């Protein structure tokens, strides 16, 4: 910051609360003849301030600043900029491998003759442990304690490693398990909106911004903080001081008018917005919300909408800072001095939105009258597939018919089940197709929003008053994103009502939303498997991809917390809530959803009485202390980690073994490559690198058994991301993956060629590598959609894949592939694997790499069958070319550090 060349004289000193603070005023650019910056979207203005502050004549030049100031909303992105976020945010599933990589870099740097303690985060890094808790116990008052005990039993080694990282690395702090979900903790506590830091004896204030190793980092856009998800590899580079190389994006303006009608929630709004934006197509673009309707949305409503930016495909879903932002900062316990600084600094910078401000210029615009939003769900397997609640029964019927068409002839429509649950009388029931077997109030998307959580509690209270009960086959759970939620539910007396419907607290973490739903009751699971029943889940999460929520639910639906409770009461997806009763009251009369749905007046009154600033202050006063189990975890010392050869959780990865000082080896053309997997459209990072349970017959399970781990202790793929041996065996191991090279199969199966032997993808990869055969993956549209899962790229690399050829990529996965030295290519001219009649049995050669690469270059791909086509290099910036040539971004950083 202090080194800014400040070519446009933007630096100025202001007084805030008796303190002199330096800022960079954007109006100085207008005075310098660069045009009126007020025409720019607020998100672009934040990027502009970042470049002005970091102008060094090398990574950020005067010309770069001029390009952003003169941003053309209609231009195809071509200007590369270097963005430096204020901080980095991590969760433990992605954070453990990030810290493993940093520890491995220290190891290699020491071998190269360097001081390992030089490998250090230069930007503040916050790591929140939230991804490890599983719903093993549910429906009991002690479920929370039991799940915490199991979490520490399974993850003690990982947690010990993270504690070492917190101690060994500067600028890193860890929020312990049992505290909350990363994005909700960020929203309620970590985010500052404006940073102030000393430089050259002066205090410099600037906008808070971040990148995070979780795609839903965008939730913080609801607070007016610029930020998005990146791969763990890119986040590590940002921590080490590397700028984020990006193309100056297009910005789609989303105009909101009106206000939500009675009965509709922020969840319904975000599902509507997700559907609209997916249909429009906003991948790689910023979305910025504006319009009079913004004023009717509370800040938690905005955070819910911003959270699902990955689901609508945008890099961000940005709400500029305004009076509502300031009100939330005060309400959530931020110091008044900080709130005053946010207001004054952003107003001086031209980054504070008011109702009188002119609308910015946008690349494209959409409009939604919030008054048109209706109660909705989304499913059965994509968040953008919104279904109006009034249409849900008919939609379920169509879904069931589609699934049944692919079932075995022996599949049944129902099965009798007897359940003998602890503390309850045995019960026998008929489990039918459409049964809701999981109902989870989960995820930061919705548990950060007091209005929908209070609604769920009031609906539970109203249901109890009518004598309704949850269906016995439903696994219920409540997993809030912060301890504040249970504080206000208890104060409102609603926790008791939820618990009477078996929605007991199971943990403060992601749980079901990321696939940690835990096992179903044995008799229910057996009935599903033995009879091929088509059962469902309802969750207040943000993703419902195939195989993600549970291996036993073939259809999964996103819904607001009160609707999750409603589906638990109904016990089935085969219901029209307007026409069909949800149950019967104590007198035998039908009860409909409208009879128990809470009014907005009741919700508002409960919010006013139950949710207080003191709850935030109390719960976040000890945010870094953690439960007793965390405090007892011992911490090893040393600048380098003491790797254990017999560890099945934390292993020294091979990524840096071949990195030597100096220039990298010359890039080579790819010759004689075989196809490891031939895939269709919308292959998610869950398909490529699942986070959930490890199947007992999988290559990863074989490895764990060979290393003395019993199946009950397998834990999840997500928890084992610190061990490359497990993760490479789990790559392409999702039980719902369909590899067209092995027709008629589901899961991580392929054929080894030319012999045609069918085997696991991992075993085929090892065989190809023994034979010296390079590999490629071929896929369709939207490859790598979903979570910002760096292991989807790391695993691809370790399986020997040199290039991936698709019709299109989701942004983060493309970046991750480059970060691991895997070449992302795209079909051109509307071609695809089908139009080219590629079977996957061909031998591929890709030329034009050795002669030199540049962004967007066309390479020639030839096959032994005589086919030839062009593929576009999806290295989009010169910096990405450099990362690829070095074999990856961290390899590039390591060589840079060795050179200095």
Language-model segments: what does each one mean?
Residues 1-900:
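Fe-S-dependent hydro-lyases/dehydratases of central metabolism
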